């Protein structure tokens, strides 16, 4: 592993079943870039994989502004039944960080969409880097996977490391995230 330090594995009992967890720390980051993999003990040669970027507001607080928390819940439920892993990347706010994400949220509250808000505070629509996920896939020896995503950038990034078959991820829209999902589809090319 060129850029990563790897932790021990530990058990993680959840509402969806028993998982294992393992942490990957980017070397030289002083612990600020630690990524988590949540996986079933014995996944197949063609596992179900969810590449999920951290979303504190959606994953932990249940925000209805995005579809992140729902996507993570669906992924964990499916993976517990079908076998596979969630690669949980610490790339809050599509890579802009929590502080900047809250500032972008404030602009969204004023009527700007998610892309406009990011651009107004000096960022691209998506600042994430998925190369770390490729190294994690290599660590587990994954050469073929069923990727649970609607994001074509994730598919393209992981095809550099493994054979990818996309499986769509259906998260219900609500009154708070309907516009956000439309922007993801129309401006970001998500396969919704």
UniProtKB/Swiss-Prot annotation:
GO cellular component, one term: cytosol
Residues reported to bind Zn(2+): 55, 66, 68
Reactions that this protein is recorded to catalyse: GTP + 4 H2O = 2,5-diamino-6-hydroxy-4-(5-phosphoribosylamino)-pyrimidine + formate + 2 phosphate + 3 H(+)
Cofactors: Zn(2+)
Gene Ontology biological process: riboflavin biosynthetic process
Keywords carried by this UniProt record: GTP-binding, Hydrolase, Metal-binding, Nucleotide-binding, Riboflavin biosynthesis, Zinc
Cross-referenced Gene3D superfamilies: GTP cyclohydrolase II
Coiled coil: none
Active site per the UniProt annotation: 126 (proton acceptor), 128 (nucleophile)
Binding site for GTP: 50-54, 92-94, 114, 149, 154
A Gene Ontology molecular function term of the record: GTP binding
InterPro entries cross-referenced by the UniProt entry: GTP_cyclohydro_II (IPR032677), RibA (IPR000926), RibA-like_sf (IPR036144)
EC supergroup of this enzyme: hydrolase
Biological role: Catalyzes the conversion of GTP to 2,5-diamino-6-ribosylamino-4(3H)-pyrimidinone 5'-phosphate (DARP), formate and pyrophosphate.
Family that this chain belongs to: Belongs to the GTP cyclohydrolase II family.
Protein name per Swiss-Prot or TrEMBL: GTP cyclohydrolase-2
Species: Helicobacter pylori (strain Shi470)
